[in-house]
Amino acid sequence: YAIPRKKINEAMQYQRDTGSTLKITKLFMQAMGLFTSLSNSGEGGELILFLFAEKFLKLPQIICKMNLKTNPEMHYHGADGVHIGVDNHSQKLCLYWGESKLYSDLSQAIYKCMKSISPLITSSLGTGSAEERDIQLLSDFMNVDDPKLENALKKFLDPDEPEFNKLEYRGICLVGFDIDDYPTEPNKLNINDLVSSFNNKIDVWRDSIKKRIVEENIYGISLHVFLVPFPSVDSFRKALLSSLAGE
């Protein structure tokens, strides 16, 4: 999530050649140091978004914005994640803008997430826009370790190239929220009971998302939405910060 794939591959090759984990250890420490210590940080949601996009959707991250930080306490404006894929039918290159929102209230989380993703996936790349800056970052700091792929991607991302018209914008959303269904005592509820409880609520959650999508006028655009119910979003943030601090 935090380190460009090319650097990771180089460190792994160094270990194979020398038997030393020095470079991998240095990258690990560098990655840990890039996370902010701010209590209201959204980086926990962004990390989960990255994991879901790569693991479940098989969409590789195309740019490591964390690695561009000059100060760990700062945040980059623009999308929370930028991933890449190819449509199986049209063979178009698809750029997936990612947004994550963690709020205690589900309605607010959905509202904020759709409000943020809308201008990204409908953008005409107006001058000075956050998404235009992300496109510039893609051109300069592309997270690939394949020269041919890098060259092809640059053509897809260049408005002056004929291939630019084959680029399609899509979205990935992660919506985290509080829910009271989790047990507060040992052995009070098993995993099957919890799954059943969530399943009973899914239709209502889905309808809320559809309503917001229509209101944002992004209906018809390909959009993956992950809903993550937490016992407490605030507790998750604190636990993540504590873990990253080695506590």
What is each PLM-predicted segment?
Residues 53, 80-83, 95-102:
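Conserved catalytic cores of phosphodiester-cleaving nucleases, focusing on short active-site segments
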Residues 57-73:
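A short acidic/basic microdomain associated with nuclease active sites
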Residues 87-93:
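Short, solvent-exposed loop/turn segments that connect beta-strands within catalytic domains
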Residues 186-247:
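Extended, charged low-complexity segments
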